[in-house]
């Protein structure tokens, strides 16, 4: 009887024990493995592995036995917790996969967005610069020779004040209006594409509220599995050494769970902050181009109807457009941060009661588990070549690489996102270009409201604003080209290293699929042998 019980114990140990510390052979962090459903394991009636205490020596057989020693002492093995370990890890894989897919679905930029937006905004800046230069040449012609000589009807030489050619000034306004219309349409197109991607994400179950509910559900399932694991550990009557190993395993599992939840929160907040920032950029871009185009239409109407005072209201609209150019990058960033804070509040329940853990804490718990397993006197159940050990090594490598590459991923994402913006959507260039348009607006207001009947003075003042904004428009043209070249270079450089955001996330999903397959394979083998 004793030999049969001992043989059964060793057979089950060899089948189920997870060599959590065999990772010392591969030098990676430790992740406990999962896959067998608890209901298919211990809860389904499988007997725990036991070790029966040895019989008393023959010399002491005739001595009276105490009540506690009258029956053999049954102790469970830490290997009986393996089904729970695998099941918890399967849930953690599900959590990480959901977080990655959430980021992908809520942060779609597309390969050609940068080029589309560049073409629309470059057309805007180029057409505006061309129209302003055409106007500036005509205004300067009048400034250079303010009075022209002519012969009156009596043949006497006389002089008269020269006036700018209204047809030429109007012709200079037309490309500006067309450019601003193209710019607004380009921003509207990108905004519409964002709305479409948002619709797709919500339809796939990755909207903000459904996503939070899904993550909370996964968290609850993991917590339930932890509770079942703790109950099984207590019922197994583990030895002191095995109980310490079980607690160390649980610490590692909880480290990974905490890190997975924190990563989802980070992805959620980051994706929503950038989407709010980008959408507000497009909305403000539409606003500034629309206001500027209406201001130019007002000036064009004044030229056609010989009403120079229309330059005053037109200047007000031009001034407003310039202020919007200055404020767009600042207001968009503030709006993005405000949206991020709103989502952080709604995500507070995801991390409520969860101890903050990081890679450093995971490594500490791994090292402690390594020491405990190394101190075991019975190492016959540990096989570095077992399915569980290999899966565990894969999990550990994945977790280590994911955390080490997180900063790299964020940097790459920032570089790619920068390439989808126009020059004026950066604070420095936006302030400079917006300032030149504000100058044009002020000059137009002075010319229209104060010097409407003094054409030469009004023209001279208008010319100063025209030259200023033409300079700003050429700055926009040049910086847009710089940003496009920089974006293509970054994509080429990162793509060769497989560090583009979508490449990194795609590789992580493939790794998770391989891990999940390995876990389920281990579970299937265990079920067949049982």
Predicted regions and their residues:
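Classical Sec-dependent N-terminal signal peptides that target proteins to the secretory pathway
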Residues: 1-44
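Leu/Val/Ala/Ile-rich N-terminal alpha-helices, chiefly Sec-type signal peptides and the beginnings
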Residues: 47-165, 169-176, 190, 250-268, ...
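Intrinsically disordered terminal tails
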Residues: 24, 457-460
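Terminal, compositionally biased segments
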Residues: 36-42, 47-51, 55-57, 62-63, ...
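Extended amphipathic alpha-helical interaction segments
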Residues: 228-300, 312, 316-319, 325-329, ...
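Interhelical loop segments of eukaryotic multi-pass membrane proteins
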Residues: 142-152, 202-209, 304-310, 344-348
């Amino acid at each position: 009887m004793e030999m049969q019980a001992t043989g059964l114990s060793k057979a089950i140990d060899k089948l189920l024990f997870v060599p959590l510390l065999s990772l010392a052979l591969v030098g990676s962090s430790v992740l406990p493995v999962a896959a067998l459903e608890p209901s298919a394991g211990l809860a389904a009636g499988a007997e725990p592995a036991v070790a029966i205490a040895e019989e008393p020596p023959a010399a002491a057989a005739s001595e009276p036995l105490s009540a506690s020693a009258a029956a053999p002492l049954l102790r469970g093995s830490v290997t009986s917790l393996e089904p729970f370990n695998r099941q918890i890890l399967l849930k953690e894989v599900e959590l990480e996969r959901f977080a990655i897919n959430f980021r992908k679905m809520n942060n779609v930029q597309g390969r050609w967005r940068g080029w589309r937006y560049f073409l629309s905004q470059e057309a805007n800046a180029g057409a505006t610069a061309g129209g302003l230069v055409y106007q500036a040449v005509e205004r300067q012609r009048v400034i250079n020779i303010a009075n022209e000589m002519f012969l009156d009807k009596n043949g006497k030489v006389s002089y008269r004040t020269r006036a700018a050619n209204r047809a030429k000034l109007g012709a200079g306004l037309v490309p500006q209006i067309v450019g601003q219309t193209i710019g607004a349409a380009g921003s509207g197109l990108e905004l519409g594409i964002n709305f479409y991607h948002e619709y797709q994400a919500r339809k796939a179950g990755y909207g903000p509220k459904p996503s939070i509910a899904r993550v909370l559900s996964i968290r609850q399932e993991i917590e339930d599995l932890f509770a079942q694991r703790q109950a099984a550990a207590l019922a197994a009557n583990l030895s002191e050494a095995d109980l310490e190993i079980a607690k160390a395993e649980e610490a590692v599992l909880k480290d990974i769970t905490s890190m997975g939840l924190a990563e989802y929160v980070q992805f959620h907040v980051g994706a929503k902050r950038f989407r709010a920032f980008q959408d507000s950029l497009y909305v403000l871009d539409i606003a500034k181009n629309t206001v500027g185009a209406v201001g130019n239409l007002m000036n064009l109407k004044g030229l056609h109807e010989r009403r120079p005072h229309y330059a005053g209201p037109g200047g007000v609209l031009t001034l407003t457009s310039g202020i919007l150019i200055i404020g767009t990058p600042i207001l968009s960033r503030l709006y993005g941060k405000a949206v991020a804070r709103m989502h952080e509040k709604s995500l507070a329940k995801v991390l409520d009661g969860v101890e903050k853990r990081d890679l450093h804490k995971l490594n500490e718990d791994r090292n402690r588990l390594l020491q405990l397993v190394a101190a075991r006197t019975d190492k016959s159940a540990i096989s570095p070549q077992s399915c569980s050990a290999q899966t565990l090594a894969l999990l550990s490598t994945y977790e280590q690489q994911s955390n080490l590459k997180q900063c790299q991923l964020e940097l790459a994402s920032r570089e790619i996102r920068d390439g989808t913006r126009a020059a004026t959507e950066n604070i420095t260039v936006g302030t400079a270009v917006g300032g030149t348009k504000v100058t044009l607006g002020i000059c137009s207001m002075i010319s229209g409201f104060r010097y409407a009947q003094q054409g030469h003075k009004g023209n001279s003042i208008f010319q100063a604003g025209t030259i200023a904004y033409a300079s700003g428009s050429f700055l926009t043209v040049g910086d847009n080209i710089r940003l496009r070249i920089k974006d293509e270079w970054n994509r080429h450089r990162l793509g060769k290293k497989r560090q583009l955001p979508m490449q990194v996330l795609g590789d992580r999903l493939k790794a998770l699929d391989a891990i999940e397959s390995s876990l389920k394979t281990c579970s299937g083998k265990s079920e067949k042998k049982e």
